[in-house]
């Protein structure tokens, strides 16, 4: 417990003081800016001094762990630092050692298999050309130097015929590799309100080296004042970094420990969103992430702000599109999925083209296992509304890289990637898993005590029911909610099977009559099966009702019995339809089906266990009923689509067969399934709008339960009739409840595996 509190405290501190990693490359370019009115002196001598103090023993400038191979990034940073020192004629020994390092590793610059900073084939040869103009000599063959210089010529020739906005942005972004080849007005069109070019210190500094500009100098002055003698590779980056923190905390399953901090970050981001802050609006990745996180946390944000990238052609015209930036593609695709209305055509369009580009990238990537491609495949296969929280948490924890970095002109570490967040997530998941195991053991005993395992007609689905509880209502303190959810899930499965397979007409009528009377001393059981089913429901509902009533400060047991009675009456209606061969209209079927799908006894009682007090007028409110209807509609139609063939063989009607029947043969089965899918999409979007809305009688934690169940039915029925497939969910159950975490080892230092 103490260790967990320490980890939380350190993480809070890190949230408050976001630290950006130092960029030697950008610092070197800032060091090259001359003093206004005296081009023989540096404007930022402290940066020059920092370069002198931070050369590595091997002559390089760059951050590398022991035994880690030299990268093109390190070569680029080293050459930039050499140029900065030569520009002011200081550090002759440093320059010599730097040139020797470059000479020893020059082949790496020409190795296309090694990851390169953005624009490397322009910036590195450009710096080589600048170095030779300063009479610097490299201990390498001239043919190798010429080969690299030729690379720049080839790239510039290839780009010459491209007059797109994206190409112009790219050329301006890598201006330090172009010298005077770029016209001043071609650069100026990309200057931001803060004076920078692309929020990039090296681009801004390189521009100042060739053309004086007051606003650009003010930006660099501000930068050096804030960071001292060494600058980051992007600034400002506050919004992106803070949103990345929020995203990471949610993905790792520990956001519940930082509720106030997350709210503060999102409140601030929302203000920036409303003000159309350039830090958000001019960066596609940040804009898409802000939209997704703000919307999913209940803030009102319009998808209109994403209209500049509504079409693939618009994305390709941007700098990120020109660079084929996978991260921005993923974020756009994720953002497109949080649609709350059929009228958000912008999101539909973004989802269509970004999904196509992601699929193309995944296919062309082949069998490579790079993390970014794994993330792309996962995003395509599992939209957020088909995933279970705890399964996602485990996957993200096991794949978390505490040395995670991104590559722009140089590599930089992401502030949220650190051992503390990983250690906290590991501790939380592992301790929660221990609780889940105890709860599952208790439930297994409960099934036997209630003799539910003695019913030959009933599917034994306890582990699935408990999975849906533990994987979504995951915080440790919500044990009573998980138990209620799982018990009622088991009981609804038993009752469903009893009405479908196990019970005669007389038995079903007897069971309903018993629930109507709700008398524990009743002895008028038509059969032993009825006795077991009723006794289990009666005992469980009364026990849960007593606990819920104590929490709510009023008696809610009657409401719980009403829920069960509604379910059984709807199931009896379906049984009568089947017995009499009655074919209902689609409207009749769906009005009954949203109840008979049996989510009511699972979700509605659990609302009483998640915190808020619900007055009786809330559970009678239109919003409450609409949340239930939309959730159940998704579940019923998903189940009908996947179970159509099986149910047809059993002689059962469902929405798909009814659509075909009532069309008079004008639509096919596939067309009926497509129509059902459209209704699913509409219901899911409308449900999300209600869940995220600030207005209404139902408290947000309670609304979230309806959404959690919607995700569960999407996960269970999105590809197969999962609840009827014995092997489909086994690995998911084991992952959440039984199997311990298997952490990756990203480096030989700081691993927390030994402590797990």
UniProtKB/Swiss-Prot annotation:
Mg(2+) 2 binds at residues 496, 500. Mg(2+) 3 binds at residues 639, 647. One of its GO terms (molecular function) is ent-kaurene synthase activity. PANTHER family: ENT-COPALYL DIPHOSPHATE SYNTHASE, CHLOROPLASTIC, ENT-KAUR-16-ENE SYNTHASE, CHLOROPLASTIC. Catalyzes the conversion of ent-copalyl diphosphate to the gibberellin precursor ent-kaur-16-ene. GO terms for biological process: diterpenoid biosynthetic process; gibberellin biosynthetic process. It is found in: Plastid, Chloroplast. A motif (DDXXD motif) lies at residues 496-500. Belongs to the terpene synthase family. GO terms for cellular component: chloroplast. Its EC number is 4.2.3.19. Disulfide bonds: none annotated. This is Ent-kaur-16-ene synthase, chloroplastic. Keywords: Chloroplast, Lyase, Magnesium, Metal-binding, Plastid, Transit peptide. Mg(2+) 1 binds at residues 496, 500.
């Amino acid at each position: 417990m103490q260790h967990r509190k320490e980890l939380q405290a350190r993480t809070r501190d890190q949230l408050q003081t976001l630290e950006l990693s130092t960029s030697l490359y950008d610092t070197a370019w800032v060091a090259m800016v001359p003093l206004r009115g005296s081009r023989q002196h540096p404007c930022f001598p402290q940066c020059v001094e920092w370069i002198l103090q931070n050369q590595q023993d091997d002559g390089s400038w760059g951050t590398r762990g022991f035994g880690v191979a030299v990268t093109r990034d390190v070569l680029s940073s080293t050459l930039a630092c050499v140029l900065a020192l030569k520009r002011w004629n200081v550090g002759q020994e440093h320059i010599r050692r730097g040139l020797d390092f470059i000479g020893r590793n020059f082949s790496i610059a020409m190795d296309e298999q090694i990851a390169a900073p953005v624009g490397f084939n322009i910036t590195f040869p450009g710096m080589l050309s600048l170095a030779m103009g300063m009479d610097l000599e490299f201990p390498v063959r001239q043919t190798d130097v010429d080969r690299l210089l030729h690379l720049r010529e080839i790239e510039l020739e290839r780009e010459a015929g491209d007059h797109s906005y994206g190409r112009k942005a790219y050329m301006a972004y890598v201006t330090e590799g172009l010298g005077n080849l770029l016209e001043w007005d071609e650069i100026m069109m990309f200057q931001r309100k803060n004076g920078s070019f692309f929020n990039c210190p090296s681009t801004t500094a390189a521009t100042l080296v060739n053309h004086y500009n007051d606003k650009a100098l003010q930006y660099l002055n501000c930068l050096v004042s804030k960071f001292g003698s060494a600058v980051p590779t992007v600034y400002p980056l506050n919004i992106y970094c803070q949103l990345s923190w929020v995203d990471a905390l949610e993905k790792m399953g520990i956001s519940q420990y930082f509720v106030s901090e997350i709210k503060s970050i999102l409140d601030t981001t929302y203000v920036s969103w409303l003000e159309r802050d350039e830090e958000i609006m001019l960066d596609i990745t940040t804009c898409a992430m802000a939209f997704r996180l703000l919307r999913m946390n209940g803030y009102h944000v319009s998808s209109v702000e994403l209209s500049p990238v509504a079409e693939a052609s618009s994305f390709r015209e941007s700098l990120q599109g020109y660079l084929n930036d996978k991260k921005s593609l993923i974020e756009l695709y994720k953002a497109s999925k949080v649609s709350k209305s059929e009228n958000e055509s912008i999101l539909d369009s973004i989802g269509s083209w970004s999904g196509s580009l992601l699929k193309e990238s995944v296919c062309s990537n082949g069998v490579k296992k790079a993390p970014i491609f794994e993330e792309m495949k996962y995003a395509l296969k599992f939209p957020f509304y088909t995933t279970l929280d705890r399964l996602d948490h485990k996957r993200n924890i096991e794949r978390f890289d505490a040395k995670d970095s991104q590559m722009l002109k140089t590599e930089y570490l992401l502030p949220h990637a650190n051992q503390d967040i990983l250690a906290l997530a590991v501790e939380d998941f592992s301790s929660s898993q221990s609780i889940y195991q105890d709860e599952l053991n208790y439930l297994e005993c409960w099934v036997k005590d209630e003799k539910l395992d003695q019913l030959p007609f009933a599917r034994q689905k306890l582990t699935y029911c408990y999975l849906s509880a533990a994987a979504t209502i995951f915080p440790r303190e919500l044990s009573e909610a998980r138990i209620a959810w799982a018990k009622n899930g088991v009981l609804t499965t038993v009752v469903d099977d009893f009405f479908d397979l196990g019970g005669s007409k007389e038995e079903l009528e007897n069971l309903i009559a018993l629930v109507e009377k709700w008398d524990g001393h009743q002895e008028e059981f038509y059969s032993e099966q009825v006795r077991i089913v009723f006794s289990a429901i009666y005992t469980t509902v009364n026990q849960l009702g007593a606990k819920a009533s104590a929490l709510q400060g009023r008696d809610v047991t009657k409401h719980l019995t009403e829920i069960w009675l509604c379910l059984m009456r709807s199931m009896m209606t379906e049984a009568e339809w089947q017995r009499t061969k009655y074919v209902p209209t689609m409207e009749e079927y769906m009005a009954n089906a949203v109840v008979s799908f049996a989510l009511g006894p699972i979700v509605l009682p659990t609302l009483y266990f998640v915190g808020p007090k619900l007055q009786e007028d809330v559970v009678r409110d239109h919003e409450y009923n609409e949340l239930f209807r939309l959730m159940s509609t998704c579940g019923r139609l998903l189940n009908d689509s996947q179970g159509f063939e099986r149910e047809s063989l059993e002689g059962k009607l469902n929405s798909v067969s009814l659509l075909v029947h009532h069309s008079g043969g004008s639509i096919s089965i596939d067309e009926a399934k497509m129509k059902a899918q459209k209704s699913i999409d509409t219901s899911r979007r409308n449900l999300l709008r209600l869940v995220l809305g600030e207005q209404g009688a139902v408290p947000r934690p309670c609304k979230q339960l309806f959404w959690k169940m919607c995700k569960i039915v999407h996960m269970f029925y999105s590809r197969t009739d999962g609840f009827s497939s014995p092997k489909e969910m086994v690995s998911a159950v084991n992952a959440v409840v039984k199997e311990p975490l298997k952490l990756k080892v990203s480096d030989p230092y700081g691993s927390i595996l030994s402590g797990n």
